[in-house]
Amino acid sequence: MKKNHIKTAILAMATMILTACNTNTTSNSSDKPEEAKKTENRFVTKNGTQFIKDGKSYRYIGTNLWYASVLASTGEGGDRERFCKELDNLKAIGVNNLRILSGPDAGSDLANPAKPYLQKAPGVLNDTILEGLDFAIAELEKRDMTAVIYLNNAWDWSGGFGFYLKECGYGDSPNTNEDGGYNRYVDYCANFARDQKALDMYYSYIKQIVSRKNSITGRYYKDEPSIMSWQLCNEPRPFSKENKESFAKWIADAAALIKSIDSNHLVSTGSEGKFGCEWDIELYEKIHADKNIDYLTIHIWPVNWGWAKRTDPDSDIEYACEESGAYIQEHQAIAKKINKPLVIEEFGFSRKGNASGTGIPTESRDKFYSFIFSCVEKNRHLIKDSKTGETHTEEGALAGCNFWGWAGSGRPRDLVWQPGDDYLCDPPHEPQGWYSVFDCDTTTIDIIKKYAKEINR
């Protein structure tokens, strides 16, 4: 999700009711040939514009749960009981895919970054959070769920570009809340794709994560069937028109590196679409046509992008859906052209009055969710053979979507997140409860369940 700076009231915290889950696991070593063979057919692969899992077309409704590795840990911020309960609740409503962050990097205090950190200094990783990632991967497998794991962030709420640039002598990432701060942040982040030292540190991190052996399952990550895709970054951008060539080279080099370590799993960019490519659809096509990028991604944020007024987003819901539909169609045309699947891996709409917290009406959000889900659901067509009269299903390029995001039993306590607060899907610097879906958002959950039945079959 992107940087945003709205100040809004947060409602009081409600009590979480947690239930236990079994954390005992059996060690399985993928060093054994029979284990490797056993998991081989369970990887998510692609065939043209379709994903394939267990020998069948794989389409899904997923969600974003960036905080998974921290919540699934046993250290600061960890709550395995809640984590397992969230997975159970998501599975029950038909959500089968999670998009998660590998773990936060040390970030600028000006950004109110997510804590605790996985990467405290270049190459220095927090074993507790790594074990949380191990646990998350293992628990997803138990429930036949999959994960997209992103390895970096263009935004400094989890360190990201700012972590590497600070280590290269550029200082802390600029405070975007100050006058002119956003433009300074953009100029600052443009250095990432063209600074070889920063890139080399990032590549070293990729090697550490992707080549890891899971302490719970005993498998190397490359052999974990619950990992669907490694993702280069959350919302990577060139951050300047002059930076497009360096940006495209970075995307290609990072994807090739991951494939050299792990040829079993898909690789994706994490791009927002042309919005994240300086509105250059040709650049978007170029980076996704790369042989090591397996599918296309887009994000859709009507309120953040000005397709709905911040003061009254509900009044613009029809226009927001219209613009979103056009955005989807433009990128789906690219997906068909280069013969790869497309996923809307982030989308969201705020509550009534652009407020945040629980108990606030979600009528417009529900309409927006229904619109996005229907785009995925209608992407499957029943085709009748004119000669034989037999029918078969033909899939379009739009293969899945992940709403932003799941808070479940978590509840907001402060205006912005503070250590000790529940993790929600709203990043720490944003109003807590702004885009999150809580387990008490019954109308939204009913819509998710309804469309999941159609899309998942």
Located regions from the model:
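Carbohydrate-interacting/catalytic domains
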Residues: K32-E34
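C-terminal motif of bacterial Sec signal peptides marking the signal peptidase cleavage site
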Residues: L18-A20
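Active-site mouth of glycoside hydrolases
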Residues: K38-A308, S315-P341, F347-V376, R380-I455
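Bacterial lipoprotein signal-peptidase II cleavage site
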Residues: N22-S29
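Bacterial N-terminal signal peptides that target proteins for export
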Residues: M1-I10
